[in-house]
Design a protein with these regions (language model features):
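Short beta-strand His + acidic residue motifs that chelate non-heme Fe in jelly-roll/DSBH
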Residues: 11-13, 31-33, 54, 60-65, ...
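Short, surface-exposed beta-strand-loop junctions and turns on beta-sheet-rich folds
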Residues: 18, 37-39, 77-79
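A short glycine-rich, His/Asp/Glu-containing loop-to-beta-strand
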Residues: 1-12, 18
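Double-stranded beta-helix
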Residues: 44, 61-101
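Short glycine/proline-enriched turns and hinge-like loops at secondary-structure junctions
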Residues: 14-16, 23-24, 64-67
């Protein structure tokens, strides 16, 4: 389970090996993905009951629109070396903003 605070998002990223399926079990998200055929960012609101299938190579990102928004993820095995960040998410930006310079 992936549980989000409102207005937090993970980085826009993709995997070359991992195949993912998400089920939205609570709340709402803004689902962002890059259409690799047109090189444009697409967005859609997803909510309880929606399912998303992410094939390898598909850049994706979620922004929680509600507190406690939850994703149930089923996927092939995850390898840290198989995550390729395209755009930073909340945690990367928070860490950057807290640097001492």
């Amino acid at each position: 389970l992936l549980v989000f605070k409102k207005d937090k998002e993970f980085s826009m990223h993709f995997h070359l090996l991992k195949d993912e399926a998400w089920y939205i079990s609570k709340g709402q998200f803004l689902y962002k993905f890059i259409d690799t055929k047109t090189a444009t960012i697409k967005e859609m609101i997803v909510s309880v009951g929606d399912c998303i299938h992410l094939i390898p190579g598909q850049p994706h990102q979620m922004l929680a629109l509600t507190e406690g928004a939850t994703i149930f993820e089923v996927s092939t095995q995850h390898f840290d070396s198989d995550s390729y960040r395209v755009i930073p998410g909340s945690s990367q930006l928070d860490n950057f903003n807290n640097l001492p310079f």
